Amino acid sequence: MKDIKARKQVEKSGAACFDRAFGSKGRGKNLMSSSIETIKSSLCKAGLRLLAEGLVARTWGNISIRIDERRMAVTPSGIMYEDILPEHIAVMDIITGRWESTVRPSGEKKLHAAIYRERPDVGAIVHTHQMNASVCAAARVDVEVNDRAAADILRASKIYCSGYGRPGTGKLTKETVSVLKGGMCALMANHGAVCLGKDIDEAFTVSRILENVCGTFLAEKISAASPSAVMTAENICRIYLHIRASGARS
């Protein structure tokens, strides 16, 4: 009887987390097995989406989806996204770190697990090497979010950059988790960005908005640093008069 009750509790917990990620329509009689297979399939598709949206190259980056309160599914290490199959997706206990898969899971699995432990509101995580965010991360700068709509989605008025930690290390995990501060993304010093969401679609939305915010930030910094590059009204007028005098037409 105790085993039956325990199993029902796990299934109930899994249903709630699965609903957050995919909606209650995805639930069936064989919840645990069907939800895990659905999640694995979703991760395979998400990997192709990473490439299509220019967020990573080759085998860079990684993605995970929460299965339930204790488990997550995460992409493998060292396999091209075009070649990832459902059996390559690891199921990992976010408390013990134990995992099951035919291949090694991502080297950043501990980072994903730590975020899920700290943030019960998070259902999916995407680690990217997107251009603008990676430039800001390499410069190790915090990025102001001046667009209110973007700030609402990112849940932050400033995107913080973590201290440096080598890939796959406890230091990287600790530094990254410490700067999330309840927000939906963070920059990882010299290592790209991490974007969160209640589901995989929201995590991708966060990554796109982060890229736009970082692009605006960089453009403003470049403009401020190069005032001489801005054309003065006098020079614009002189160019106009020169073109007019030469008889040239646009």
Residue spans of the language-model regions?
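Cationic, low-complexity basic patches in intrinsically disordered or flexible, solvent-exposed regions
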Residues: Q9, S13
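Glycine-rich flexible loops
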Residues: R27-S250
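Residue-identity detector for glycine
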Residues: G14, G23-G28
